[in-house]
Structure formats: structure tokens, C-alpha cells
Amino acid sequence: MSSSLSLDFVFYVLHTCAIMSCAADSEHEFQVLEGICVGVSDGDSLHLELQSGERVRVRLYGIDAPEKNQECALAARKKLGKLIYNKQIRVEVLDIDKYGRYVGRVYAGARYVNRFMLKEGLAWHYRHYAADDELLAEAEARARAADRGIWASEAPCRPRNFRSEKRKEGES
């Protein structure tokens, strides 16, 4: 087993234990979705076909990948697709967003996909929604330090700022 995969497994086990302890100690219970990834919209969104045949949209919790027409957007979508497309995945649902998407922690086997995308430098840690998630913060910090992915750019633009600018351009 490669050291990266074994580290992912260790983080998966620790994360799972933390979630189980949280669920046991409070009213928090996580809905878990399992199925096959049948589509990847971008670097932080996917389509999941559940075992029942129902298809649902999923947003990766705590990350914000580049938008279409933004630097690294295609690389992020391709990397996510290579990792999960047409594969069995598990989603620990934390919320449902205003677009009706399930927002959650996505796992492909033992690999925590949200963290993986940050580690590869293909997304920002979305602190607005996941400020206390140290695993995600640490993964982004490592990618930044290594100038990986979006961090190789001289002036990376956060996707939420990119979206805001596009909306302003549309208003003009």
C-alpha cells in the first residue's frame, strides 16, 4: 500500500471515529448515501445513482473547486471523474443546499475525496461552510506550500469571487 493511500486510510478511520463519537454524543446523525457515481459536473459536484435507482446530486462538503472557464477547472473535473466516475461511493450527508443537492463527505473506498481534491490543489477549503474542519484546512495548506494545482498560479481567484464578478458583469 502506498504511503499516500495508507495516510488516507488513517484519516478515514480517524474521521469515521470522530463522526461516530459526534453522533453518539449529540443529536447529530448522518444520513449515508451509497451508490454509483454516474456523472461529474465539476470539481466539487457529482451525480449519484442510489441502489434504488434514484439519481441525486451531491456537492462535496467544505471545498470549492474552480468554476467553468476558470484556471484548473477542467483539471479538477477530470481528477474527480478519474477518482469516482462509474465507481461505488459513499456520502455522509451533512446538509441539503439551496439547490437541492446533498452536501457531504464523499468516500471512494477508504479515500476521503473532499480532502484529496484539496491535497491535489484542485479546490479551495470553503471556510465559510467548514471553518472548523482541520483535515481540510491542513490539506489546502500543504497544497499551497507545494504550489500544487491552483496554487501554482501567481494570483489564484477563489471560485466564489469569480462567480461574484460574473454576476456583476451580467448586471452591467
Descriptions of predicted regions:
Residues 5-172:
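Small beta-barrel nucleic-acid-binding modules, primarily SNase/OB-fold domains
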